[in-house]
Amino acid sequence: MLKPGIRSVQKRFITETVVRSTQPSVSRRRKTTHFTDKLNKGPSFEDFVNGNAQKFTLDPLEKARQNSEEVQRLPTWLKVPIAKGSNFHKLKNDVKELKLSTVCEEAKCPNIGECWGGGDKSKATATIMLLGDTCTRGCRFCSVKTNRKPSAPDPTEPENTAEAISRWGLGYVVLTTVDRDDLVDGGAYHLAETVQKIKQKAPNILVETLSGDFRGDLEMVKVMALSGLDVYAHNMETVEALTPHVRDRRATYRQSLSVLECAKKTVPTLVTKTSVMLGLGETDEQVLQTMKDLRAIGCDVITFGQYMRPTKRHMKVVEYVTPEKFDYWKQKALELGFLYCASGPLVRSSYKAGESFIENVLRGRSRARI
């Protein structure tokens, strides 16, 4: 026989069980997922049965993300000779000896043979990459190494960079950096110091810096603009609609526009410059709007080049744009009032043809002031 206390507990347990079993169960609906949304937008089972699935088209972002069959072989206009020549090997040895990094090597630029191997040393161009060879961001088009916490900046780098450039006897040099979101100033003071040391060792050298967005900190943009450089470059990379897919989430289209605008307002005589890749799935209307946005903030120079997939881990090419189309965009840029436009399948933001033109413009301005 059960004790009174145990009988009471047993009775309460049975009662609660009966109540729970008679109450209607409330089903909890799962939150709609991104995967479900994609399924709902796509063809149904009935569409597949009826053969209508092909009628569903992808928007530009989906096309850029999923394209795999349309583009296979590299067109003839994108094939380049193997890099060689005495100047090429001299620059390569100097870079290695002074423990410098170049975007030419790290980003696997197809123009390295042309830029480094010119017959005239004064026309050779190397884009020095400062603050190490490891970026804190992970853009889907870029082959530069990434890490959340790269090694600390090398304090001797500004001096070594200035020494290398003075050895090469260049008339024009480009400095660029990886993004360093781990640093409070984004590396702005390190880059500014490098510009100043170059100007001390070789006052006649024209200096272009291709910098990041400093997380939108416009005070750091001003530090760079006031460092003594001649050309302030910051790349838009792509059109606004594709920016979230192509670039790291910390880089935005409007933020990049604000960087170029701030640099121009800080030092109005600065030449401001940007670069846009084509072949990512952009439309003509989007490219034209990007150029209009850039002219609205006073950007002087723009370059267009073909996106080329560095490795299979990176986003795929949607389209190989023809040389004729690049000529079309150059004409449009000049019509909109850009000071200069370099546009071609192999053109990159630091392409030497553009630098030669800008060098002549800047030196012409200098002579006019004397």
Curated annotation (Swiss-Prot):
Its EC number is 2.8.1.8. Its main location: mitochondrion. Binds 2 [4Fe-4S] clusters per subunit. One cluster is coordinated with 3 cysteines and an exchangeable S-adenosyl-L-methionine. One of its GO terms (molecular function) is 4 iron, 4 sulfur cluster binding. Coiled coil: none annotated. It holds the Pfam family LIAS_N. Belongs to the radical SAM superfamily. Lipoyl synthase family. This protein may be expected to contain an N-terminal transit peptide but none has been predicted. This is Lipoyl synthase, mitochondrial. It comes from Kluyveromyces lactis (strain ATCC 8585 / CBS 2359 / DSM 70799 / NBRC 1267 / NRRL Y-1140 / WM37) (Yeast).
